[in-house]
Amino acid sequence: MPYPYYIDIINKRSVGDPASFAGECEAIFNRKVAETAATVAEQVVARDDHVVLLSGPSGSGKTTTAQKICEALKRIGVLAHTISLDRYFATPDLDTSPLTEEGEYDLESPYCLDLDLLNGHFHALERGEDVIVPHFNFATQARDDSMAMPLTLGRNEIVIFEGIHALNDLVADEHPNAFKLYISARSDIKHYGRLCFKRTWTRLLRRVVRDEFFRGTGAEETLKLWANVRQGEKSFISPFKYKADILFDSSMEYEVPVMKQFALRAFQDVPDGSERQKELRALLPALLEFEDVDAAFVPPDSILREFIGGGVYEH
C-alpha cells in the first residue's frame, strides 16, 4: 500500500526550495523505474518470455513510464520496445462495437480492441515470428495501414504492450507467462490525518490538462466524460490490478503544486451553471490549498511532461 503525502510538508518545500524538491521527487521516481526494469529483466529471463503487459487507468502516465522502463532496460543490456494497445483499436461498427448509454462509441470497453489480432500477435511473437503492428487513427476513427509497423523480437529483446486493458482477462489470459505491471497515481494527500486531496483527483488533473494541451478538449468536456471513464475503470481495469507482479505508484509529491496553475486555467472555461460545476465544488477549494511550483523545475523526461508538454517522449 502506498504511503500518503502530507500537504504541510508539500507546501513548505514548494516555497522553501522548489528546485531541490522537484529534483528529489524525480530521483525517487527514476529509482523506482530502475528497480522495476531490473526486476523485469530478471523475470523475463526466468520465464523465457519476451512480453510485458503494462496496465493502468486514464491519467496514470503509462506511456512515459513504459518508455522510461525501456530506457532503463537498455542501460542494463536488454533491448526493449513499447507498443500502445491503442494501435489495436478496431474500426467502429454500430452493429458490433460497444456503446455508452448515450449511444456513443465506448472507448473504455476492451471490446473496442481487435482482440483476435492482438492475441494472434502474442502467439506469433512467442513463436519468434514477425508481426505487423496496426495503427488506429482516432481522428478518422479507422485503421491506417500506412502507419503500421513491423515488429521482430530477437533473443534478448522485450516488448511492453501498454494500455488500460493490458491486464484484462481478455488480453492477459492469452499470455499467462507475461510479466505484468499495473501503474496508477496511488498516493492520497492528507492534512493531519484528514484526507484533503484524493488520488483520483491527481489523475483527473492530469487528464484535464493533457486533453486541453494536446487534444484541444476543454475541461467541461473532459469532466463530462470522467464519469464514464471511472465506470470503465471499475468494470474493466481495477478488478485485474492484483494480477500484476508490480504495482507502480506514478504520483509525485511535488505534482499538485505544478499541475495547479494549468488546471485552474482550464477550469476557468467551465461556464457558470454548467452541470460540471458540481464536480468542482470539492476539488477547487482543495486545489487552492496548495502553493505553486513553477513548471520550469520539471525536467524534460518527467512523467509530468506527458500532461503539460515540453517533454522528450512521444505520446
Regions found by a protein language model. Name each.
Residues 81-83, 90-139:
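Conserved nucleotide-sensing/catalytic segment adjacent to the nucleotide-binding pocket
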Residues 62:
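Conserved lysine of the Walker
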Residues 71-81:
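Post-Walker A helix-loop "phosphate-sensing" segment adjacent to the P-loop in P-loop NTPases
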Residues 65-69:
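Hydrophobic positions on the alpha1 helix immediately C-terminal to the Walker A/P-loop
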Residues 52-54:
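Hydrophobic anchor at the beta1->P-loop junction of P-loop NTPases
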Residues 45-47, 119-177, 223, 228-240:
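Glycine-rich phosphate-binding loop used to anchor ATP phosphates in small-molecule kinases
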Residues 1-35:
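Charged, amphipathic alpha-helical linker segments immediately N-terminal to NTP-binding catalytic cores
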Residues 18, 30, 166-315:
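Conserved NTP phosphate-binding and transfer environment spanning the P-loop NTPase/kinase superfamily
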